[in-house]
Every structure is written in C-alpha cells, then in structure tokens.
Amino acid sequence: MSSNWVDISKDTNTGIETIRAHFTGHAYDPHWHSSYLIGVTESGIQQFHCRKKQINSHAGQVFMLEPEEIHDGHAPASDGFTYQMLYLHPEWLKQRLQGLFHNSPDHYELVIDAPLKSDDQLAIITSQAFRHLHYKEMNIVKDNSLDVLIQYIAQGKWLKKASQSS
C-alpha cells in the first residue's frame, strides 16, 4: 500500500486551488502549470529540478514557480515529504496586484527571482493563506491573508514582459 496522499481544494471566490500532499520516492514527472505556484515544505526533503538545477526544499522552506516553469518531484529520503501549495492564476494575480499597487502598469508581471526561499516570515504568511483558503475561512479572512502574501512576495519585484504578437 502506498503512503502517498493528496488533498485538493478550490476557493470558489478566487478560483485559487490549494493542495496538501505527501509523497515517497518518485512523486511526479516533469510538467508545468499555467499558474504561479507558492508552497511550503512541511516535512522531509522535497527534491525537484527547475531552471536547470536540482533543488532540495527542506521543512520550513518556501518554493515558488512562475507559470510554465517545468519541474518534477522526488523524495530522496524513505520517509518522503509533505507540502502545501497555492496555485495563483496569472490574471487573478495581475488584478490583485493592480488593486494593491496602483502604480502597477498593465504590461508588468510578478517575477520570481529564485524558486527556493529560506524565509521564516514568508513561510508563515504562505501557510496562513493556504490554511484560510484550504479550510474555507470567511472571505474577509481569506482576502486579507492573500493580500498580505502578495504584498510580501511582490516587494517591488516587477519586470516588463514582452507582449505576444497575435
């Protein structure tokens, strides 16, 4: 019997999906998402390849990916790893950024400078937002925790993206 498990939830107001999961051994093949990912490794070591590097996320570390970043997943230790994650849709995030930062031009997007962060405050803020969405707290509580998270991760990190030609 496998000790792997996955618990998925979706917030009806924001469309944000949350996942809490535990994997041992091979967790998932290389893939990508159309959303921004931000999560916290709760226990164990989560090993993944991203941006042409092998990354080891330990308990308490935060991992963040931009849309379409290819990554995989593996548990190098026999006891596996547990993580929690939020999937933030780019359009929702863009609207939220413009609401929080009124000087945010339409043609700018959030850029994740590094996929792994050792930042205790960010881990706490991310876990709070996860819990409030995953366990369906009141909307005002969810909205506030998301605003705190977005303000923390944005911290002035903007990069002009080239517009796609039609």
How does the language model describe each region?
Residues 5-106, 135:
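N-terminal regulatory/effector-sensing and dimerization cores
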Residues 102-166:
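Amphipathic alpha-helical segments enriched in hydrophobic/aromatic residues interleaved with Lys/Arg
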